Every structure is written in C-alpha cells, then in structure tokens.
C-alpha cells in the first residue's frame, strides 16, 4: 500500500525551494522503492488568493489523510494588511493545531564545511549539534482571551494569555527526554519560572517526568540566561526542551550559530509520529522569484520526514550524506558562500544534491 505525502509549497520562496526538495524526494522514492504518492495543494497566502482563507477545509482533510506533510513557507507583504485572523500565518497555526502536531524538533547542526559561515569563532561552534524540542500547539500563540480593548482613559491596550496544562507540559517533556535518551542523555529545560506562573508549573512537571528517565542529566535555565549561554558556550547543550514562544526565539538564535537558517530543517510530530516537515526559515519575500534561495533546509526536512515518520533510516542517511558531499565540493548558495567557494542558485544546488544522491 502506497504512502501519501501532501506537498504544500506556500508563499515567497516556498515554491522554489519545494521544487528542489521534491526532486530529491522523487529520486529517493525511486532509488529506494519507498512507495510514496505525492499530492500538491496550497496554504497561506496562496490559499487566500485561491480560496479566501489561509487553509481550506479540503486541504486540511488532505493533510489528515496523508501520512506526512511537506511544507515550504507562508506569508508575505501582500497579505500583511488583511484581517489578522485570516492572514497566511493563521493557516500554519491551524494545520499544526488540527493535526495535533504538538512536538517541534529543530536541530541546530554546524556542518564542518561551514565553520567559517558561523557568526561565532570556529573553536566555539566546531562540532555543534543541538536539538531544540519546542512545544507547538499551546502557550501564548493559542491562548485566550486575547485582543485589544479601550481603557477608561481612552487608551488602547492589547493583551495575550500564556496558558499551559499539566498534560501539555508532560507530553512535550517526554519527547525531550526521549530525544535525550538516543543522544547524549543531557536535557536542559528552559522556562521563566522566576516570573511566570505557567513556567512554574512547567518546571514542576518536567521534574516529575524526569523521575522516569534516571539516566538523563536534567538542568534548568531561565530563558534570558539560555539565550546568553547559546552565544557564550553553545556546545554545553545537547537537547533543549521549552515552550512555544521561547522555542520560537531560541531556535532562530541557534540557527545563526550554524551559519545560516537556510540550512536548518524541522519536524512537527503528533503522538504517533505523523508529522509535518518544513524549513526553519520563513518565506523570504525579499528574494522570492530570484532563484537564489537555499533549498538545503527543505531537502533536509525530507530526510527528517523519512527518519521520524517512516523509519526509513538508510534513505534519510543517504540524503544527509548527499548534502554533505555537495558542501565538500565547495558548492554554496549566497547565504553560506565564502571566498573560494562556488556560488550557485536554488536550482543548481538542488541539481547538485540530486546528482550526489544518485551516485551513492
């Protein structure tokens, strides 16, 4: 029986990078006889233009029926002035929520070939391999009440709510500990328990879950200290588990330790490891249509999909090896280019990975 993968290119550079990722996926499908069937649909601004909403019901139904979803990126200035509840980003939040994709895995890995592209000294980041586990369907992005009200003095006041239940914290903590068990058996939980009630509960529940994982060394950091430590001594971290807002910020910060956010994939998983896979970067409307975007994060998202949703380790390893071989050849898109390397565009980078994968 074939496995269904839904392709959602999205907006901005999304269609360009997705074209290259699909080329790699189709080659892997053929080379390793994976039995995948690919279907395509729209999300975000493209869905607003077509359906009037950022995520159509029929698209959501296709996502529910699929075994995995591969996403490009959403959003752009074209849709910035429309009502907040129907902006492109709401489609992304809705599909995560409706599919129950509560666990977001964001690796921050520095390829040795890109040590000179990092914003930090090579001796600080060499060998960097961090996994950030971010809670994805709770917290301040989904909390109610939220809105804007007029105070008695006529001034407008905006407000949001940051709620977390015990069960939401417990399930993401388990993901963090499970990831730590198959890596370096070190887990750092990041919160703001000195200020926030939700973080106080977060820390309490993480401590409870830790009792089931005696082999894992657990530490806690306040988010402001964690942000500082990521720059000061990032290799002290192995797995970080944190909430939605903090994870959003810290994972982008960690991405720059690797040289470019254009290198970083992500996985968003439900309780059964059905997932949606996407690059960590956004839609980059400023470079959309120029053919210069880095497709490697999306290609590596394909590898994560094969690994986490389908347990196809050999095919996943092969894609990662192909990317590494291309970097060995000195091939670079502009965001990771340095003197003496070969600067290429989006399509050329995708073609290079396809060629490397074909020759493995």
From Swiss-Prot:
The record marks 141, 192 as: Important for catalysis. Binds 1 Mg(2+) or Mn(2+) ion per subunit. One of its GO terms (cellular component) is cytosol. It is an enzyme of class 1 (oxidoreductase). It is found in: Cytoplasm. Substrate binds at residues 96, 106, 134, 224. Gene3D superfamilies: Isopropylmalate Dehydrogenase. It comes from the Bacteria. NCBIfam families: leuB (TIGR00169). Belongs to the isocitrate and isopropylmalate dehydrogenases family. LeuB type 1 subfamily. This is 3-isopropylmalate dehydrogenase. It comes from Pseudomonas syringae pv. tomato (strain ATCC BAA-871 / DC3000). The gene is leuB.
